Amino acid sequence: MTPYSSAADLGSTVSPLEGLSSVITKNTSIVSQYLQANNLPQPSPEANGPVVVLPSDAPQDVQQARQQLIAASLEIFQLAIGPSEFLPHLATNFQYISCLTWLAHYDIFHLVPRDKNISYADLARATGVPEQRLKSILRMAMTSSLFREHPNGTDVGHSAVSALLASDDDAYSYATYMCSKTAPMAMSMTEAHKRWGASTRTNETAYNVAFNTELPLFDDLAQNKARMGEFARYMRSVRSSETVALKHLVSGVDWESIPAGGMLVDVGGSTGGAAIALAQAYPHIRFTIQDLPENVETGEKAAAASLPADIASRLTFQAHDFTLPQPVRAADAYLLRMILHDWPDEQAVKILRNIVTAMEETKSRLFIMDTVLPKPGSVPVSVERIARARDLTMIQSFNSKERELDEWKELITAADPRLQLIAVTQPLGSAMSILEIQLSAK
């Protein structure tokens, strides 16, 4: 993606506001004309508005125009409010989280009919909450595109955003997890640092402060099936995002370079989604999917029940803890997808070393698919701020982090100096990059 030209880069003859206005006008036209030319719906706040603005196969220049439009809109907003109004607008952000939490708790998303309006009075009776309080919270939420009020002032209906949360269980779990877990963790980050400083222990985190537990996040969630189910649905929603779609893994590497009958080991591969996507595209490769026993059992049963024999026969499910030495030796490829960002450097090095012990020099390759943080200002702020929010979430959850390229290089070298980073690829539209690593001869 080309770097975004901020207001400071627009030249001295044009004011920042005028320059950004031109960027917005230009890129709005590109996006709108593409949608019109391809008979696609224009973005709309109405309940029947499209969930996705651009299809995943939209041309690169159109995708970039959308990102430039978002970034310029964010920057012109900041310039227009000025420093004097920064704090009042900042306060709206946590109030939106508060509204979302309240609306989810009282099941407002599902009590508002999908295809018609409902009066505030009837909705208040259905929920057992005071009508005036319901109005106050809904009307605040409406200023961030959640729900829409009928012009009569007495009825409320869905917007495009609230309709999505009402109809998509995974997206709804994303919202409730954000409110019940991510937001409290974020607000506990300072207290965690005051208590434990630069600790990288997984049970000395903002999560531990927020929820008063001595257990690491995953161990704590595992104590409660409902919470673990919410987390699983939340992760399903995250992984369904276009930016982390499996197609980027499938197309982002020259998998044809693996010889016929070669083996790829998906370390921490959950129930096999990534390996199955690769198996469907590359019939010459065999796969071993490794994860904790309950995950591989679930994946193995699902694969046997739903996959054609020519794919299922190339999948092997194996219970394995990646904090222990890798049992599959001399495989052609090992894959760590969305794994290492959950772990502080010390544990991440251990995970890598456990794989290195199984790699065959010059033959085996290790592929890490994870976030590579951009250099500040090198991508549109709309992209950068989401990446940096993920980085903070990793700190707050696990005392881990998203890594810059130099940090990845240091991590790889610390695991074994023989490991050589031979390629870094970020597929178009992917939030993650693929690091290709080989074990050199001694």
Curated annotation (Swiss-Prot):
<comment type="pathway">
    <text>Pigment biosynthesis.</text>
</comment>
<keyword id="KW-0808">Transferase</keyword>
<dbReference type="InterPro" id="IPR036390">
    <property type="entry name" value="WH_DNA-bd_sf"/>
</dbReference>
<dbReference type="GO" id="GO:0032259">
    <property type="term" value="P:methylation"/>
</dbReference>
<keyword id="KW-0489">Methyltransferase</keyword>
<dbReference type="GO" id="GO:0044550">
    <property type="term" value="P:secondary metabolite biosynthetic process"/>
</dbReference>
<keyword id="KW-0949">S-adenosyl-L-methionine</keyword>
<feature type="binding site">
    <location>
        <position position="291"/>
    </location>
    <ligand>
        <name>S-adenosyl-L-methionine</name>
    </ligand>
</feature>
<dbReference type="GO" id="GO:0008171">
    <property type="term" value="F:O-methyltransferase activity"/>
</dbReference>
<comment type="similarity">
    <text>Belongs to the class I-like SAM-binding methyltransferase superfamily. Cation-independent O-methyltransferase family.</text>
</comment>
<dbReference type="Pfam" id="PF00891">
    <property type="entry name" value="Methyltransf_2"/>
</dbReference>
<feature type="active site" description="Proton acceptor">
    <location>
        <position position="341"/>
    </location>
</feature>
<comment type="function">
    <text>O-methyltransferase; part of the gene cluster that mediates the biosynthesis of pleosporalin A, ascomycone A, as well as a third cryptic naphthoquinone derived pigment, all responsible for the coloration of conidia. The pathway begins with the biosynthesis of the cyclized heptaketide 3-acetonyl-1,6,8-trihydroxy-2-naphthaldehyde by the NR-PKS pgmA.</text>
</comment>
<dbReference type="InterPro" id="IPR001077">
    <property type="entry name" value="O_MeTrfase_dom"/>
</dbReference>
<protein>
    <recommendedName>
        <fullName>O-methyltransferase pgmB</fullName>
        <ecNumber>2.1.1.-</ecNumber>
    </recommendedName>
</protein>
<comment type="pathway">
    <text>Secondary metabolite biosynthesis.</text>
</comment>
<dbReference type="InterPro" id="IPR016461">
    <property type="entry name" value="COMT-like"/>
</dbReference>
<dbReference type="InterPro" id="IPR036388">
    <property type="entry name" value="WH-like_DNA-bd_sf"/>
</dbReference>
<dbReference type="InterPro" id="IPR029063">
    <property type="entry name" value="SAM-dependent_MTases_sf"/>
</dbReference>
